[in-house]
Every structure is written in structure tokens, then in C-alpha cells.
């Protein structure tokens, strides 16, 4: 732009605000100053060498993009890109008069004269006429606005010289405009005199021709009324905001919209009885407080339908006389779809049980249609006429059904979370498992298969080790018998016994606890002494079985589980030779 320093900054800020205001955009002075400082940082050449033209401005945009790639997008002011884009559009539109004012600081009077020649030379289609005073008034107004916009804030004494210099430059612009206008006026006056000097014969012209001549003469006689064809500001309409499709109504508004679509505008509100009996009392309808419904919905969402506070809110709602339709609408509006299905199912079951119990016990019969709101009591207007006793039964069933809704997550993990504790006996675990399964499904083959599968999967690690050998062949009774005395010591002892007999652990457990044979092997019980089947240890007649096992390692060789008298090793565990083993006869001689 040919100007640097504080003067260049003020001029750039004023021109920037002027250009953007013509497009209906308002930029704060602080944002404009921040953009100018960033512009100097990115393109140091711009204040001295650049100008407000499309080529230089595109170069600035490329350097801004390069700066963002090197330093990151966070280093660029948030208003930099929008301002650059708006100025690029203005420069593309070639707004000559505004750009001439922006470049006025570095243009001489002769250059201004050349630049204004194109604006002052008008064709016959572009000429506009009026009073000369009006023309100058419009020019003065535009120039004064520019001066006031630039010098609308007080400055220090050291900046007064810059201010006077800029005002002188504005006066130069006005002087060039006036000179071009005077030259144009003289040329028009010469043409007008030549036109008037022409000898016209009045008799040779028709009235239509006279009208045309008068119109043309009026144009030429109005030289004093020539105005400068100043380009008016083009005020662009702001784009209309995008109209988003409104969201569907929810809650009571959604119910109202659905009722309007179906044509059912009959409202059912809580019934209020003012008297003591149905004979001397007329029901009065009042709306359920919206605050109560919001409180109930909030409690269900935040704490769950089975929380104590939620149940208190339900009891508060139940203190009024609600019809079946009221309860269904309240449950549907506050509960989740899954919980609403559970509530409705439980409500129907409670209503059926109440009808069966009330059969023959009341003078006025209570039908299932009254409690469910079906049949002849389907419409809300018919439910309003129900007696107090029926409405009381409806409320009781609705509250009981609400309390039957399980807590969140319990219904999904009730069986998966039923596991045997580390210190819990296996028979107690089986009892809890059967109770939970039979609550969910009736007794039968399917429930037995599920219990057997969970009895293995949800057992603790100790019982699983005991059950594993007979998992596929045993029954629930075999599982219980195998885990009857389950403890770590029992498992370790069984492992030692299997190792001493040279059997696998699984084979030993099968022989001991059976595989679906009532706790015995295929050939009867197994003797722990001789390892044979058909008898137990106390009935074993084998002499070898009566010999007592050694308590530990051999004291002679230290590397075998046998008695010292039976040791046949010639070397001990360290490889040292051992003396010959003394017999009982040699020991007696030494004595």
C-alpha cells in the first residue's frame, strides 16, 4: 500500500471497516488491528509494496496458508480467514471507487485524474441529471463520511501532522473531480449553443416531432444540473437462515398432537369425589399436576423405577383417583419401553387375580374390563363413571405392578451373577440356583438342563475340580455328593491317594464318587488299601494292605519313601557310598 507504521495501520483499518460495512458486515477495530498485525507478520512486504488488488491479495492468502502449515492453525487469529475471504470477494467484484479511496495515500494527483476519467466519462445510457448542488452534496457526504470514519477518535499531538496530511489528500480528490466536471460541462454547453443556433421551420414539423425536440432540448438545456455518476452502494440482502425441520413434540404436547390426528380430543384427568359415597357425590375432573409428572419422570431416569424415592412419588400419584387410562398414560410417559411392557403384563396379572378373588364377595360385580379399561370401558368417558371401589382396585394393582419392576440390570444378570461363594457349601448354592431358575421358568426338562449347566459353570474352583471328572456322566445328586466335604485338604488328599495308586486324578474321583452310579464305580466300592473293587479298606483281607506306610523319606539314603530296613540303595542322595545294611541278627551280636 506504500504506507507503513501507525499511519498505515490506521488507514488500513479504516478502509477495511469501510469495505466490509458496505457488504453489511461489522468488524470491531480491535479485530481489524489484530488482522493487520498478523498480515504484517505473514507478509512483511505488503505495507510497502503491496496493494488492495486481487493479485497481491491472493499472494497474501497463499502465505497465510503456508504459515498455518508451519505453525499450526491455532497460531492464526480466528477472524483472519473470514476477513481475507470477504476482501477477496470485494476485489473480485472490482469496486473501483472504494479501491481508489483505499489506494489514495500512494497515488499522485495526475494518477487520480487518470483513474477518475473512466468514472466521469458516461455514455448516453449512464447519464443522470439533477441539480449541481445535489451532486456536490452527495460527493461531499461520501468524502466527509470517509474523513469522519478515519478521524473519529482523538489522537495525540504527535499524530496531528498525519491527520492534516490525509485531509489534504482528500481535498485533492475533490479538486480532481471538480476539474473533470467543469471540462465536461463546457463541452455540453458548446453542443447546446450549436443546437439552439439551428434554424428550424415551425411549419415543417408535426406536433409529435415538436414533442421529441422539446424533450431533447430539455436534456441539452440542463447542463447546470449535471451530477457526477457516483456509484451507489449495493446493499446485499443477508441470506435467510436455514430453517430446520422442527422436532416432533414430546410428552403431553406429543399426546395432544396424536389426539388431533386421530380426532380424539376427550381428556381424562384424575377423578375427584367431593362426598362420602357414590350416591351423593358427582365426580369432578382435575388435571394431574405437571410438576408431579416431571418429578416422576426425573426420578425414573436418574434413580430407576424401583428406587425408594421413585416409589414415594408413585404413592403420591396414587393418592388421587386415577382411571386405567390415566395409569397407562402415566406409565408410558415415564417408563422405558421395556419397563412399560413389564408393568403392563404385571398389571394384567394382578387384575385377573383380583377378579377371581372378588367373585361372589361383593354386591356389585367387578369385571376384568373395568380394571383393564377394555370392552365397554375402553373410552375415557366411560371410565370416568367407575365407582370408588373399582378405582381403588385399579390404583392398588397399578402400584403393585410398579413395585414388581426389577431394578435396572437385575433382570439381565440374575442368573449370570448367581455364583457360589468361596466358603459357601455346594448344597446351599444349588438351593439358591434352583429357586432363581424356577422363578423364571416352570419345572421341566429345560429347567433341569439349565440348572445342571449353571451348577458347573457358577461353582467355585474347588467344586469345579471335584465335579470335572463326572461333569458329563453325573447328575445333580452326584455333584452334591462329590462336593459334600469339599475343602482344600480333601482335594490334596485325593490327589496323593491317586498318585500312590498310580491312577489319574479324574479316574480316582470317578471310582470314588461314581459317574451316575449312585456314588460307586461300575464294580462296587474301591479299597483304599489294595486298590481292588468290591470291598473297602476295613474289610480288606490282603496282608500287604495291612503294612503301615513309611512316614517320610528313608533315613539311610534320603531319596526314597520306604522303611530303612527295606532300603537297597548303595549310594545316598549325594552319591556317597553307603555301608552294608545291618540285619537284626548282627545287631543282636553286637549287643
UniProtKB/Swiss-Prot annotation:
It comes from the Viruses. The record marks 99-100, 195-196, 228-229, 254-255, 269-270, 496-497 as: Cleavage. It holds the Pfam family zf-CCHC_5. GO terms for cellular component: viral nucleocapsid. Residues 151-191, 568-591 are annotated as: Disordered. GO terms for biological process: viral budding via host ESCRT complex; viral translational frameshifting. InterPro entries: B_retro_matrix, B_retro_matrix_sf, Gag_p24_C, Primate_lentivir_Gag_pol-like, Retrov_capsid_C, Retrov_capsid_N, Retrovr_matrix, Znf_CCHC. A lipid is attached at residue 2 (N-myristoyl glycine). A motif (PTAP/PSAP motif) lies at residues 305-308. Coiled coil: none annotated. Residues 151-169, 178-191 have a biased composition (Basic and acidic residues). Keywords: Capsid protein, DNA-binding, Host-virus interaction, Lipoprotein, Metal-binding, Myristate, Nucleotide-binding, Phosphoprotein, Repeat, Viral budding, Viral budding via the host ESCRT complexes, Viral matrix protein, Viral nucleoprotein, Viral release from host cell, Virion, Zinc, Zinc-finger. A zinc finger (CCHC-type) spans 525-542, 552-569. One of its GO terms (molecular function) is structural constituent of virion. This is Gag polyprotein. It comes from Mouse mammary tumor virus (strain BR6) (MMTV).
